[in-house]
Amino acid sequence: MLTASQKVLQQLAALLLERAGLKITPDGFHSLRLALSARMPVLGLEEPEHYIQRLTGAGGEEELRSLLPLVTVGHTEFFRDAKQFRALEKSVLPDLVSRSRREMRKVSIWSAGCATGEEPYSLAMVLAELGALSLEVDLWATDLNLAAVEAAKQGRFTSRRAISINQARLTRFFKPVEEGYEALPALREYIRFDGQNLAVPVFDKVALSSLDLILCRNVIIYFDLPTIRGLMDRFLAALRPGGLLFLGYSESLFKVYDRFEMIEVDGAFVYRRPLNDKSMRAPPLRITPYPGEPDVAARRPVPADAFTADLRKRMLPEDVPLTTRLPAVSASSVAAPGSPSVTLPALGASSSPRSVVPGRLPAVSPHSPLPAIAARSRVTAELPTVGSVDSARPRITTELPAVATTPRAPTVEVPAWPTLLPPAERLAMAVRKMAQGDFSAAIAGVQRLLADEPSDLDGLLTLGNLFSLTGRIPEAREAFAQAIQREPLCVEARVFGGVAALQAGELSEARSELSKALFLEPTLAIGHYLLAQVHERTQDHEAARRSYRNAIAQLRFPQRPLAGHYPEMPDSADAISRAARYALAALEEQPLR
């Protein structure tokens, strides 16, 4: 492997932090050495210092784009996180399509950090199934890695990557090609792919308050705290009031950023720009035109573009003008308490409190008695309007005689969303108990989490590990089985299942579980390391040496963090490499070089 000084690695880490917001600690310097070994020969460079000069000189931005995929994990999949996509399919996207049609505009969505495109294609399939046309949708998918963006544009996926797409969707939206499937042109029309660095201080392609939905999942785990906060400021400014932000399942803004409000949608926790947030309203930034689109200043005003005209034609009869779509509401009209509930207003839309009352309440006229008051037999008229409150005045009861004065229009207090602790934070509390050696409290904490979130993958894996550490092997097996039931391709359930079996002395089971994990993810270094330990226990020293060497060899590939938590398991590339080399040296009875 290339030899690079600590100073060069620190300079490279500082550049990645400054230019891309990536925080790489000394534990991750092994991945930087691997990246240098891969990029320097391509550029014809022999000294790491010259590579640093290339990054900081002309053409440095282009080289940065080539470097980043080597130090980050671009793992993604179709319909990733079933709970979030259930919320998108059942509530979020249907509401956005309906609302955008009412407002005669496009649904505006940003898939930020889209990698090779599985996420935006998943969104496009759902939108198509909801009946949204491609011309009704502006689905912008971006990534810093331009090679990944180009691959996403092609829409080609191997059979293994397409495994989570059901057969009906494969038949409708893809055509079989060699070694996999290719998205049909009709599906690709929904998406426009582009390069975008999320760490830049200004998004010059995004207008203020223009987006309905942003998905930025499993991206901010690579960023340092200032970069995350700056990115959240820009996301908040880009979303419409009431717009939603989806982060990765294990990502939380708890004690990081408090300007979003967290809400629950069909079991998924998401972040929302407050409805009454006016702090970001300002003259919109100039939007970069799409390729081939005339500049904003060069566009000639037209009474109605083709998009709006098409929507009018499909949504309204030709003889009905737009202004007659909704009936006029008379201020004096009276609705009985049992009348149908009022339709909720669109998010961010203003409405008079006399015509629309938030929540499912009966329509109420300003001049009709409140239902609760009208039901009281001893009151024959409404209470008078009250000015200032006199604390010395005795409390008013229903025994007061009727007062014939003009009543106030009723108001309804809508309770604020409760402050909810996200699953990731609840799990972190249990992990702290585990670190303190309080396993009973840790188990109880994770079990309470799973009572509320029964399919929480991190929780299931951590609970299995807690059972394993406390000798409750059958319960550990059950927890890992539930994790596999939720995610059939869950590598971690196989890895931790192998560890539990190893602790119980079930070496055949341990070998089987770890082999299954490596079948699913052959480059997982920790899997090879643990399998080597199983071989050592069975006295198969040759197989153990081979597995330790495999663990070291796989470190040339980026290693992702495992879901779930197991204390003191080597997790960084350097830690795995060091442990494997020591074990290998001990087996070979040779001193470390």
Swiss-Prot record:
Domain of life according to the entry: Bacteria
Record protein name field: Protein methyltransferase FrzF
Role summary: This methyltransferase is one of the proteins required for the normal aggregation of M.xanthus cells during fruiting body formation. It is also a component of a sensory transduction pathway that controls the frequency at which cells reverse their gliding direction. It may methylate FrzCD to form gamma-glutamyl methyl ester residues.
Swiss-Prot/TrEMBL keywords: Chemotaxis, Methyltransferase, Repeat, S-adenosyl-L-methionine, TPR repeat, Transferase
Record-listed E.C. numbers: 2.1.1.80
Pfam families hit by this protein: CheR (PF01739), TPR_16 (PF13432)
SMART domains documented for this protein: MeTrc (SM00138), TPR (SM00028)
GO molecular function: protein-glutamate O-methyltransferase activity
GO biological processes: chemotaxis; methylation
Swiss-Prot/TrEMBL TPR repeat ranges: 423-456, 457-490, 491-524
Record-annotated CheR-type methyltransferase domain positions: 1-276
UniProt key word Electron transport: no
Signal peptide (from-to): none
InterPro entries: Bact_Chemotaxis_MeTrfase, CheR_C, CheR_MeTrfase, CheR_N_sf, SAM-dependent_MTases_sf, TPR-like_helical_dom_sf, TPR_rpt
Reaction equation(s) it catalyzes: L-glutamyl-[protein] + S-adenosyl-L-methionine = [protein]-L-glutamate 5-O-methyl ester + S-adenosyl-L-homocysteine
Lineage, highest ranks first: Bacteria, Pseudomonadati, Myxococcota, Myxococcia, Myxococcales
Keyword Repeat: yes
